[in-house]
Amino acid sequence: MARSPVEPPASQPAKRAAWLRAELERANYAYYVLDQPDLPDAEYDRLFVELQRIEAEHPDLVTPDSPTQRVGGEAASGFTPVVHDKPMLSLNNGFADEDVIAFDKRVADGLDKATDLAGTVTEPVEYACELKFDGLAISLRYENGRFVQASTRGDGTTGEDVTENIRTIRAIPLTLKGKRIPRMLDVRGEVLMFKRDFARLNERQRAAGQREFANPRNAAAGSLRQLDSKITASRPLSFFAYGIGVLDGADMPDTHSGLLDWYETLGLPVNRERAVVRGAAGLLAFFHSVGERRESLPYDIDGVVYKVNRRDEQDRLGFVSRAPRFALAHKFPAQEALTKLIAIDVQVGRTGAITPVARLEPVFVGGATVTNATLHNEDEVRRKDIRIGDTVIVRRAGDVIPEVVSAVLDRRPADAQEFVMPTECPECGSRIERLPDEAIARCTGGLFCPAQRKQALWHFAQRRALDIDGLGEKIIDQLVEQNLVRTPADLFNLGFSTLVALDRFAEKSARNLIDSLEKAKHTTLARFIYALGIRHVGESTAKDLAKHFGSLDPIMDAPIDALLEVNDVGPIVAESIHQFFAEEHNRTVIEQLRARGKVTWPEGPPAPRAPQGVLAGKTVVLTGTLPTLTREAAKEMLEAAGAKVAGSVSKKTDYVVAGADAGSKLAKAEELGIPVLDEAGMHTLLEGHAR
């Protein structure tokens, strides 16, 4: 069913109402029949409320098939239709506290509750409060305690027979227990999928190379409406009972809360997040209490439901065409909404990560007005095919950063533009590079880039780097925010008067920091390399670089092939080092540190190259405890024979030498089929007898 291409203006109520009916019906079909919802709940609700308003103002425009007159959806062709003995109606929605107060007032008026002169209800109504699950509504029919049929809500009057699929859900009893077993019981409830089960299902889908589900609701609906019940049986579905259709052969409980208590005695699963309250104040207290805990709940909910608790009062209030007067669904602020994507900029993180950010037309979602949303990385933009000018679905849940979920493709304008990742950092002009096998592109101006400045300074001052005692994060924040320090070289120009002027920085602290800076000028090459904050270069690699090259300039000028000769330096690390020193801004800061900052370290000749022995070009990994050799002695023997001794096992490893208590490295070698030697085998290898 195609989306209506032209949206008539509100000034033409007849055309507007017809368009709204068609659009809502199309959305209902996608939601209920195809299980492919393409309209966020908030947008559907907005269109529905608008249609209600037009029909209220123009009663002659109401049609029998209007979405306002029924629930929506129709039986899928693959399932047998089931006519409900009692309609499965939807609920009226409330979105603001005022809607709840108005609902309570209507109920009190309908029940002739006492009020004071100001119209305030003095005899509060008793309500049962429960959660509004984001799943699929189901009717379960039991005859003499035995489960005989299950059906979906469908259009509220006619649903789909899903009996065989429901039988596979372990939470649903096939036989009721207890003493008060009715001749016939029609249980209403919700099939859903818990968050943890949803995550595990998608893991299985990924492993099998199958399509992942967008959310738990889609997963539950798609699982339940399988023509092959074996597929449903493999899916982790759950169920909660919350209502009743027809009852025969037993007394109806006097209250809704009593009904749910009775269900528990019958062995039906009932959610415990419920309460009985009085008046609008009690309703709102329950709503806000649940809202505070919403993200920590093990399942998705999109609101709470209020029902007049007493059954006789429910009967007095009755129904309107599509919903009971005695109940209200109080929805949380929508977590998804539609808006237009105006532009895509890039943001530079503290570690240089380049993140595409969507600039949006303001939209209220998740309880806040959103104008920006993350697009994560370039690959995600391509995968989702998101373009500038698109109408997009934006999601914001709790404190999670807003994200663009998808583009609405049939609303894409002809002039929509594809995103192009910039080649230069917007903050400092340095090159943007993306290493092989990494999703994140990064600015290469680590020592120079303003966006990375605080992180670079903090790392530079670490104990394992230049060990500048007294230069903590709060001091760095002040120095950067007051533009006193732009690069690590500027640290060595700080004077006493500058430091004592900082907030909460006493004279003694200033003198101590100046002393620490003076001491930091005398360091080692390995510490200095580590202090530069080169991506993938830790302490161990910094030491290996210093030992291999002996001085800084050869490292700065080394081609990738030369870097690959360093112990434990692979292609990714070599590429990262090469890119760092290829960036002119970084080289400038290093020269400032050596000249203006006068940071020095002892330098020496490069390490002697290993002779071209029997193991030239081979990579060996040591693991466990050898009988007669220390790890260091074995390493020296192997390197003397031309081998590269690596710290981890990979497909490029030629041999693993294993001693006692060898652990995961040995297991990895066996998994990859790499030859494993003991100490005697290593000696044989060194003698040139093994190939």
Curated annotation (Swiss-Prot):
Keyword Magnesium: yes
Cross-referenced PANTHER family: CHROMOSOME TRANSMISSION FIDELITY FACTOR 18, DNA LIGASE
Top EC class, one word: ligase
NCBIfam families, sorted: dnlj, PRK07956.1
Recorded family membership: Belongs to the NAD-dependent DNA ligase family. LigA subfamily.
SUPFAM superfamilies from the UniProt entry: BRCT domain, DNA ligase/mRNA capping enzyme, catalytic domain, Nucleic acid-binding proteins, RuvA domain 2-like
InterPro entries noted in UniProt: BRCT_dom, BRCT_dom_sf, DisA/LigA_HHH, DNA_ligase, DNA_ligase_AS, DNA_ligase_CS, DNAligase_adenylation, DNAligase_N
Protein name: DNA ligase
Residues involved in NAD(+) binding: 41-45, 90-91, 130, 153, 190, 307, 331
EC annotation from Swiss-Prot or TrEMBL: 6.5.1.2
A cellular component annotation (GO) from this entry: cytosol
Sequence ranges assigned to domain BRCT in this UniProt record: 610-691
